[in-house]
Amino acid sequence: MKVPLHNFIPSVLDLADTALRPLDSTHDLCSAFPVMQQLRPHLTSEADFVSRIERMRLEGYRLIGAFDADVLVALAGYRFQENLVYGAFLYVDDLVTAEAQRGDQWGSRLLQALERLARASGCERLVLYTGLANARAQRFYFREGLLTGALRFQKQFDTP
């Protein structure tokens, strides 16, 4: 699969929702850390977060932020992938709205933008995972038209 250039993405977002924009700079990532930490509380260091994102970018990971009056209130991390199960798809690694802004449609707006991006990039679907115990997120995804399609298994390894 030919992964679209990131330069293409801002124009797709700008046409659709002016409150959304890519989070590309180190400053952007630092401002994203407190919001991301609400989804990923195990992330305790801003410097480690920025370093991880920079490594993940080498694998195609990108972040989009949603802004209310220049304040970052929600974000989505995604990447384009292709496999034998789904074909070409957009995978959503992270989707979170700051606690104080939940219910204000920021998550919906981000998902809509990601769907437009996936379609414009020739993807066959949008895929994401959520924890089995995360009933609130599951209700949100069902309301947004996403359906369950798989059960993921994992095995935790002891670290040396």
Describe the residue ranges of each PLM region.
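Short acidic/polar active-site loop segments enriched in Thr and Asp
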Residues: R62, E124, L147
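Conserved active-site alpha-helix within GNAT-family acetyltransferase domains
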Residues: S108, A120, L132-L151, K155
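Acetyl-CoA-dependent GNAT
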Residues: N7-F8, V12-G87, L111-A113, L117, ...
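Residue-level recognition of the GNAT/N-acetyltransferase active site
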Residues: A98, G131
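A conserved beta-turn-beta hairpin within the catalytic core of GNAT-like acetyltransferases
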Residues: E82-V92, R102, T148-G149
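Conserved acetyl-CoA-binding loop-helix of GNAT-fold acetyltransferases
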Residues: T97, G103-R116, R143
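Conserved beta-strand segments that form the floor/walls of ligand-binding pockets within enzyme
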Residues: G77, Y91, V96, V127, ...
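Conserved GNAT acetyl-CoA-binding A-motif
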Residues: L111, A118-T130
